[in-house]
Amino acid sequence: MYKRQALASVSPAGIESSAYPLDKGINKIKISRSGLLYVMYHTDISKPKRPITVHIPVGSGTVNGYFDVTRHTDKDWKRMIGKAPHSMFDIVGRYSMMILHTEYLRAYSPDSITKSVQTWDESVKAMWKIMGFDKYPQPHNNRQLGVSVGNGVHMFATWYYCGYSIGDNGNTMKNEVIAPGVLQGNRLWGIGHEIGHCYQHPFNWRSMSESSNNFFAQLILDQVANRINGNERATDMENPCKYLLEDVVKGKPFHDINGWAKWGFAQYSFYLYFHKLGINPEFYPVLFESLRRKPLAKQQYEVSEAHLAWYERVCNVSKTDFTEDFEIFNWFVPIDYKGNQYGEYSFKMTEEMARASKARIAAKRYPKPKFRIAFLHQHGKTVNLWGKNLHGSELNGYWTKYKENARLSSSVSATRKGSMIVVRNGENAAAFCVTTNGKVVGYYDRQQFDVSSVEWNDTSRVYAIPIQVSEPYKLIYQAGKS
């Protein structure tokens, strides 16, 4: 039992450590590096924890102390951080633990830290909850670790902790780690993105490694930053029509689409549909449990198998046929590609493979979803990373319209003025699309849009797309007719 204890030293660089096993009785050890010391007591959580006592005589070392949100107040913090002798200081929350540079904690948070701990704790708690960890009697006997580092990239994630650089004179800590800076605009995104790397594995495969983790980043903007700030302003989700117009209508397979669509549609749109709209708030916890029991692919991160398996798993877990939404994003367009993302991968999906996958879902005879989620988003009234207003009106497809079950106006119509299409009474549409020669050539998210970049002739038509799957597209403009 005692072999499971360890004494570790963590250097100010935050990326190196040494471990020293402890036995019952007197232990005499020689520390090989300078740093902070931690006693780690690893137990089997299926058995009652046996209390132990570890006494550490302070020889040549110095007591640094640590802040524990369950025991200390901001008044304690002010005293502790003011006297801390070491270059790093520990902050222990209920679900999180940060080891940050003392210099910048004194500079940017000298009087209080509880708001920061609340933000970190609630972020980790939200991620654990969406994965269904709260369903277990003792889901975790540990905390999510973050460390500020003296050099390296802006932010990064390892298997053990997330790192936040101070190479920019502490600006990352000030603006994207510590409150109030981290709660302004979309700045909590960075922490969510990096911690998301630690949790993305069940629904990740190569080519998605810098995308699927953004599900967690957007999740905590929605559930933490917006809730604490009392508004809906924090979001880094873009309207899908941008990518449908730029990439999808040109025939690119989903793999080749850049930006938001990689995570916005593949993962986050199902959070909006099931959780934000209240259709099935248990969808993601059940899905993650399914993924823990049966991974998407036999070989971790294998692309060809996981890509189609994700589509089938979403449909099977929800007992809903989302095929039409996946088709809009070219999920089934054949591809034969070799790439590298944290390792080489090969992605080959033939038309036969895609057809067989869709047939397996069709055979289940699941109902279609209530709403068209391919256009569902949370872009709305938003700000960017530094608080600058991006636009002042909600675009078509914003989630609140779905929540209201808003229906197309019977008087929705459109006219063309030069290259501009102007829609009237179209605020309840999920989106608009243009077809030429019977093929969709553009999707649009607002009631006034430019069609000069798409093919246009006498066969061109403009349709309003209803939110409801049960309602057909409505023709609102036909080329050659007034």
Model feature map: region roles:
Residues 55-90, 482:
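Low-complexity, Pro/Ser/Thr- and charge-rich linker/hinge segments at domain boundaries
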Residues 3-67, 410-482:
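Beta-strand-enriched, solvent-exposed domains that form extended recognition/catalytic surfaces
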Residues 32, 87-97, 209-219, 315-339:
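Short, solvent-exposed linear motifs at loop/edge-of-secondary-structure regions
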Residues 41-43, 72, 213:
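Short, motif-level signal for alpha-helix interfacial/capping segments enriched in acidic residues
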Residues 306-442, 458-464, 480:
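Beta/coil-rich, acidic/histidine-enriched accessory regions frequently appended to metallopeptidases
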Residues 77-79, 87-300, 310:
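Catalytic cores of extracellular degradative/oxidative enzymes
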Residues 1-2, 326:
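N-terminal low-complexity segments that are often proline-rich with Ser/Thr-Pro
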